[in-house]
Structure formats: structure tokens, C-alpha cells
Amino acid sequence: ATNSDPFTSPLCEFDNVILTPHIGGSTQEAQENIGLEVAGKLSKYSDNGSTLSAVNFPEVSLPLHGGRRLLHIHENRPGVLTAINQIFAEQGVNIAAQYLQTNAQMGYVVIDIEADEDIAEKALQSMKAIPGTIRARLLY
């Protein structure tokens, strides 16, 4: 098998299984350390939005934020960031911080705002409707 061959496994059918790339480790201690490292990186993404050391995804290391944090993954093409910012401008919401990283195929933007949950949810629905959106979610 080569890196260009599709990965097939019966485990791919389960929604509650996360498959990670093979990371070489020839000792029990190395395997345990790798397991802790992978779990830590998944936790940082799910809890904070950080994607440090990502291989096929834009890398972003994020500080903690006390307000609302929204994530937007999109096709890397002109106008997406403008459309995102317009959503908040139309609602009169100031963006406290914004982090953008792209690769050739996709962009990953994290938006921190000081707003209540209703406004954040409304913004999320508008972000999902932006052409080129792959995924958007309200992290917290």
C-alpha cells in the first residue's frame, strides 16, 4: 500500500471511532507516549480549536477566550473571510479576536466574540450558509 491508496477498514463505519495515522513506536513506552500525545492533540482541538502539528489541515495554536468561540472550515477561495466578517458587522457584534490559517485546499478561521448564545447561534447558521463552507460550529 502507498500513501495515495485509500484507507479501508471496517472501523470506518463507526461514528464513535476516531482513526489516526500510524505513528511508529517500537517499544511499549513509545506506544504509551504516542497514545497520550494523540489524545492530547484531539482534546485541544475539541476543547479549544487548536490544530497544532496537523498534517493535512491548517495549523492554529489558540489562547483561551472567555466569550464565544466559533470555528469555520472552508474551501480556500476569495471572499469567505469577508462574508464571515460581514455576518458579525450586520449584527453589530465586535470580533474580539480572529485567527486564520490556510493551506492550498482549505481555510480554518476561529472567531472569538463577546455576545450571548442566541447571537452566536444566529451567526453560526449564517456562517454555515456561506458558499464554500465545509463545516462550522460553535465551540463554546
What are these regions (language model features)?
Residues 1-64, 108, 140:
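Rossmann-like dinucleotide-binding domain for NAD(H)/NADP(H)
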Residues 52-140:
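A conserved regulatory-domain signal marking ACT and ACT-like small-molecule sensing domains
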